[in-house]
Swiss-Prot record:
GO terms for biological process: protoporphyrinogen IX biosynthetic process from glutamate. One of its GO terms (cellular component) is cytosol. GO terms for molecular function: uroporphyrinogen decarboxylase activity. This is Uroporphyrinogen decarboxylase. Catalyzes the decarboxylation of four acetate groups of uroporphyrinogen-III to yield coproporphyrinogen-III. The gene is hemE. It is an enzyme of class 4 (lyase). Homodimer.
Length: 344
């Protein structure tokens, strides 16, 4: 289905710096386990990776929340660790424990891995299928993990709140760790570029572990590589917005916004929207930042939280979203209530 011009696609227009009232809405992890149609499909297909690498299944999952809720944006169903899988690490998902990568890069280098770039091809197939089926007014978002966050998994093999293993490697072997970051900048730029060529309208960089770094390290391992990525994507694809989501960055958000060149900044639920409005560059699009637990809880508490966010960004382009991914136990009715509240 042919996409409409940006001015008739609310989300794309706002990501390009326009303000719309009401703001466009999409939710991180909007395609997933809280939806009964997702659970039914997963029962027929096996594990998460089997779904992610099945272009037909992944396209269907991407489209499910659009059909049910009419979100203004569809986000590709995939995972941030697809890139290290293509770079030669083994990727598996352990029930109740999250993703695991091996061999780890604690004492190894990228030269020890054997890349398998063909692993990325089904992702581009998913993009093409979604693009063909997506409603014309809906913006299509691609995504990747940011280099720092992906590197934490490549080094330690799994996520952890403090990322101690990866931070130790960065302190002890900064040149070796820089090589990992540089390789991820290259791989991520190519990956997102091919998503754009296949049909996405904008892309988001998920930096889930950005909050684990001290200011100087944040500058080197989050801001600098993100800025490189954004420059490359803007040069290759003028007019395609890039959203940066440095979860946990807190007081480092203004520097991130100024120095990376992203077109929009995602706010996690710990950020005071009024503070963000006062301290982020004027006119920069912001995205967020409802607490996912407020959505789970519902009721008047949800209404109050939604209203506070809607009133926090006078005159600023705003995309309504969560502060992190939607939770498994989120009732469908609460998502419907959220949309009704935002859209009036």
């Amino acid at each position: 289905m042919a996409a409409l011009p940006a001015e008739t696609r609310p989300l794309l227009a706002v990501l390009r710096g326009e303000r719309r009232d009401p703001p466009p809405v999409w939710l991180m992890r909007q395609a997933g386990r809280y939806l009964p149609e997702y659970r039914a499909l997963r029962e027929t297909k096996g594990g998460f990776l089997e779904l992610a690498y099945d272009s037909d299944a992944a396209a269907e999952i991407t489209l499910q929340p659009i059909r049910r809720f009419g979100f203004d944006g569809a986000i590709l169903f995939s995972d941030i660790l697809i890139i290290p899988h293509a770079m030669g690490q083994d990727l598996r998902f352990e029930a109740g424990e999250g993703p695991r990568l091996s061999p780890t890069l604690v004492d190894r280098t990228l030269a020890d891995l054997e890349p398998v770039p063909a692993r990325l091809e089904p992702i581009y197939g998913t993009v093409r299928r979604v693009r063909a089926a997506l409603p014309a007014e809906t913006t299509f978002l691609g995504f990747a993990g940011s280099p720092w966050t992906v590197a934490t998994y490549m080094v330690a093999g799994q996520g952890s709140r403090e990322q101690a293993e990866t931070r130790r490697k960065a302190y002890r072997d900064p040149a070796g760790f820089q090589a990992i970051i540089d390789a991820l900048v290259d791989a991520t730029a190519d990956y997102l570029s091919k998503q754009i060529e296949a049909g996405v309208d904008a892309v988001q960089l998920f930096d889930s572990w950005a909050g684990s770094l001290a200011p100087r390290e944040f500058e080197r391992w989050v801001i600098a590589p993100t800025a490189q990525l954004v420059r490359r994507l803007h040069a290759r694809h003028p007019g395609v917005p890039v959203i940066g989501f440095p979860k946990g960055a807190g007081g480092k958000l203004p520097a991130y916004a100024r120095e990376t060149g992203v077109d929009a900044v995602g706010l996690d639920e710990t950020v005071d929207p009024a503070w963000a409005h006062a301290n982020l560059p004027e006119g920069l699009t912001v995205q967020g930042n409802l607490d996912p637990l407020a959505l789970v809880s519902g009721g008047e508490g949800l209404d109050t939280a939604v209203d506070a966010i809607l009133g926090a960004f006078p005159g600023r382009p705003h995309v309504f979203n969560l502060g992190h991914g939607i939770l498994l136990d989120t009732p469908i009715a609460h998502v419907e209530r959220l949309l009704a509240r935002v859209r009036g």
